[in-house]
Amino acid sequence: MRRFFLYIITTLLLSVSCTPKQPAVYMLRPHEELPEEISRDNSFTKIFLAGTIDMGNSRDWQAEIHDKFSEMNGRYILYNPRQENWDATRPGEMEYQVKWELDHLEDADMIIMYILGTSKSPISLLEMGLHAKSGKMSVICEKDFYRYDNVRITCDYYGVPLYNDLESFLDTLE
């Protein structure tokens, strides 16, 4: 009887410890922190959302990406540099923002860059240059972007997947 009881307990413990983790998506922005148990959990894929923000005046494509990943069966942390209350005049804010982005670009397992056609996006071009060789970047660039050919040629040269609109990229995630 004791052997049977130990067998049942061992089986239950193994089944609990081997249960797959539940799907989850977290969005992390500058000046925010993840719960400690999430930040230590290596089962999450970390994705940096690089690209057009235009001081918060552009399409909130980061929210669309979040919605898409929320529908998927996986565990994701989305690093989103877009701040709700961005204030470049606050002392130290620019340095904090740039370093936050650089740190999280390096930490990411994947970089999704979206450049809107109506934007100049000089920082996005800089980030693309820094990470094109990383093997972890996908670029979405609308054809009416004023430097589209530069982006297209660079993506081709380094083997970076290039999409012309967000919807085409999102379709690849299904």
Spans of model-derived segments:
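Bacterial N-terminal signal peptides
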Residues: 7-15
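Hydrophobic alpha-helical context, especially transmembrane and signal-peptide helices
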Residues: 6-8, 41-42
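Positively charged n-region of N-terminal signal peptides that target proteins for export
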Residues: 1-4
